[in-house]
Amino acid sequence: MNALAATSRNFRQAARLLGLDSKLEKSLLIPFREIKVECTIPKDDGTLASFIGFRVQHDNARGPMKGGIRYHPEVDPDEVNALAQLMTWKTAVAAIPYGGAKGGIGCAPGELSTSELERLTRVFTQKIHDLIGAHTDVPAPDMGTNSQTMAWILDEYSKFHGHSPAVVTGKPIDLGGSLGRDAATGRGVMYATEALLAEHGKSISGSTFVIQGFGNVGSWAARIIHEKGGKVIALGDVTGSIRNKNGLDIPALMKHRNEGGALKDFHDAEVMDSSELLVHECDVLIPCALGGVLNRENAPDVKAKFIIEAANHPTDPEADEILAKKGVTILPDIYANSGGVIVSYFEWVQNIQGFMWDEEKVNMELHKYMNNSFQHIKAMCKSHDCNLRMGAFTLGVNRVARATLLRGWEA
């Protein structure tokens, strides 16, 4: 089941639990606006290349639309649509005043030079500048984009609208980016994990973890687990997977990776088959990489007691059912990986106020938002007798539905 089908299915289940009327349910699914633009740029060799850019603006009942821009060869309108819809529910679960959006350009960023990427980003911004803005739609980095991409968007947008630091988040610090943004998703994942473990009388200290993915989110999660006395006993990325039953030395592994070393070449670990990573014995499994990695083939063999969805849509619905029957508790992506968008919101607030926070305040506020969301999700689980995924979806959908009705948009 693809991301769009799974997101729509979760939404419909939540709508049924909430007793939404069919007209309102239908209107909440339909995107506010879908944008498709053609971006032609001169390449460094003088030839012209054309790319298709998308932006799906799903819902703005609760505030400006918010979501990343990804550069990837397989950017597909259906996937962008699903991710935009997911952002609507995610921002509502996090109780930040945004709706949902997502965008992307179908390109292979690794095959374009820095100057070609800059030209492409600026042309894309020129095509959509009058449809985004601090109080309309606020993009952010995603797969294949970064703070430099956001700096180019900010600069190009400002040529039309004057200095507008709040038009994008995930910017470099020197252009109004927030301290703590780099670690935000990984740190949020660990605040969510702490909240869940505490509910079961456990803590990070003394628990064992397996992490799939060692990019930004996975490496921050591993670092924080290590600092808090937990053991990362297995870890994998695209280069391979490794394990150490006594716990990997995360600072040494980070140093090895930052010096260009592959995971499988790390001295203090045993190389393992990557297909065994997700079914490795552990207390907590954290998928931080791709969607759909937990499916009906491997779900019966999962040995973790808790799964924290740091990636988007890592568990397909069939795996969800199998894992539920096994008694595995899943903390859903819509909540678990919301640290990034929460700190993006803090960045936007700081830009609008023109008053920057220190990192301690950012982390303190993030902790508060993650804890509050968990308590609200638990309350929904109790009210509707459902699991954490449905608790989060009913919380998000209910907040958007209420805002929609209050605005008088339901007709």
Swiss-Prot record:
Its EC number is 1.4.1.3. The active site is at K102. It comes from the Eukaryota. GO terms for molecular function: glutamate dehydrogenase (NAD+) activity; glutamate dehydrogenase (NADP+) activity. It is an enzyme of class 1 (oxidoreductase). Induction: Slightly induced by NH(4)Cl and NH(4)NO(3). Induced in shoots after nitrogen (N-deprivation) deprivation. In roots, first transiently repressed but later induced by N-deprivation. Induced by alkali stress. Up-regulated by salt stress in old leaves. Activated by IDD10 in the presence of NH(4)+ ions. Induced by cold stress (i.e. 10 degrees Celsius). The keyword NAD applies. The keyword NADP applies. It catalyses: L-glutamate + NAD(+) + H2O = 2-oxoglutarate + NH4(+) + NADH + H(+); L-glutamate + NADP(+) + H2O = 2-oxoglutarate + NH4(+) + NADPH + H(+). Its main location: mitochondrion. Expressed in roots. Expressed ubiquitously in various tissues. GO terms for cellular component: mitochondrion. It is found in: Mitochondrion. Belongs to the Glu/Leu/Phe/Val dehydrogenases family. This is Glutamate dehydrogenase 2, mitochondrial.
